[in-house]
Amino acid sequence: MKYVLIQATDNGILRRAECGGAVTALFKYLLDKKLVDGVLALKRGEDVYDGIPTFITNSNELVETAGSLHCAPTNFGKLIAKYLADKKIAVPAKPCDAMAIRELAKLNQINLDNVYMIGLNCGGTISPITAMKMIELFYEVNPLDVVKEEIDKGKFIIELKNGEHKAVKIEELEEKGFGRRKNCQRCEIMIPRMADLACGNWGAEKGWTFVEICSERGRKLVEDAEKDGYIKIKQPSEKAIQVREKIESIMIKLAKKFQKKHLEEEYPSLEKWKKYWNRCIKCYGCRDNCPLCFCVECSLEKDYIEEKGKIPPNPLIFQGIRLSHISQSCINCGQCEDACPMDIPLAYIFHRMQLKIRDTLGYIPGVDNSLPPLFNIER
């Protein structure tokens, strides 16, 4: 049993959740059976552009986290390592979440035995500011009137307060400089097979979640949750499996196309990079937001490096140190770029460097248990 279709048996979950409610139902099972201390999930805040990481210990509150929030990109890796390392938890994990968690585990920051990862297939996320501008421009509505959004069949779909639905092809949005975040456009890992389960709507029947079982723990979770009546399962058709594989293949080809565009054809010149680095105000947002930056004592704050009062900082020192520390483990989550108030395209250089390491040494961060290259050198 590698692939299954799953549907929640709880009507409340079915009404609120996406495509069958499998993820929420499995979290409810884990909490009710006290297999975890809590679930770290994203809860909607003021609107669809505001996602709040929330640690839930009462299964009745899980339904508040059901549904998608594509316009509130975040990463759970650092939150787990910093605040929940001693807890047994479950987490909904996009590929970059799962990669960060697994990479941090290699660096002894997270104990994977304490983390159930329910993976979420991901075709990309949209920054909240971009989303609001995009909705106003292309959908011709007030962004604050949007009550729900989803990505389906290559379209970004919104639902308004009056129940009206509007959709635009993502390809059209991205041709105009909107749509998914640039790092998401380049990402070729859409199915989080490094998690215990990988869940999504690709190939799924209406009202069901298509689930790929990726670990023995994931298999046992599905079997036990079905036995105790939390979910219903059935086998997907061969055609459904093929549809899912085809969608993944198309998305990977598109990602490679964007990699070539961003990291080769449009990659900034040295002169352009100098202009970017001169914008830096040394706010440390890139470091603080990076899920793989975890040192208690940061090299960037050493007296002999910090150059107190100097803005912009020397890029060979400031960003050079970050590159040497992070590039081998960069998961292309884009959090550094999102945090930068000066719009420096940081993910370009980090992702480009990681791809060179991948192509040279064969190392892909966060997909398996192999150590990063600098930790795995033979004398």
From Swiss-Prot:
Keywords for the protein's UniProt record, in alphabetical order: 4Fe-4S, Electron transport, FAD, Flavoprotein, Iron, Iron-sulfur, Metal-binding, Oxidoreductase, Repeat, Transport, Zinc
Disulfide linkage: none
Binding residues annotated for [4Fe-4S] cluster 2, in chain numbering: 290, 330, 333, 336
Keyword Chaperone in record: no
Regions crossing the membrane: none
Binding site for [4Fe-4S] cluster 1: 280, 283, 286, 340
Reaction(s) catalysed (UniProt annotation): oxidized coenzyme F420-(gamma-L-Glu)(n) + formate + 2 H(+) = reduced coenzyme F420-(gamma-L-Glu)(n) + CO2
Cofactor mode of binding and number, as noted: Binds 2 [4Fe-4S] clusters.
One Pfam family in the UniProt entry: Fer4
InterPro entries xrefs: 4Fe4S_Fe-S-bd (IPR017896), 4Fe4S_Fe_S_CS (IPR017900), Co_F420_Hydgase/DH_bsu_N (IPR007516), FRHB/FDHB/HCAR-like (IPR045220), FrhB_FdhB_C (IPR007525), Helical_ferredxn (IPR009051)
EC code: 1.17.98.3
UniProt feature coiled coil, ranges: none
Every 4Fe-4S ferredoxin-type domain range: 271-301, 321-351
SUPFAM superfamilies: alpha-helical ferredoxin (SSF46548)
GO terms, molecular function: 4 iron, 4 sulfur cluster binding; formate dehydrogenase (coenzyme F420) activity; formate dehydrogenase (NAD+) activity; metal ion binding; oxidoreductase activity, acting on CH or CH2 groups, with an iron-sulfur protein as acceptor
Cofactor(s) the record lists: [4Fe-4S] cluster; FAD; Zn(2+)
Known partners and oligomeric status: Dimer of an alpha (FdhA) and a beta (FdhB) subunit.
Function noted in UniProt: Catalyzes the oxidation of formate to carbon dioxide, with coenzyme F420 as the electron acceptor.
UniProt xrefs under PANTHER family: 7-HYDROXYMETHYL CHLOROPHYLL A REDUCTASE, CHLOROPLASTIC, FORMATE DEHYDROGENASE SUBUNIT BETA
Family: Belongs to the FrhB family.
Name of this protein: F420-dependent formate dehydrogenase subunit beta
Organism: Methanocaldococcus jannaschii (strain ATCC 43067 / DSM 2661 / JAL-1 / JCM 10045 / NBRC 100440)
Originating gene: fdhB
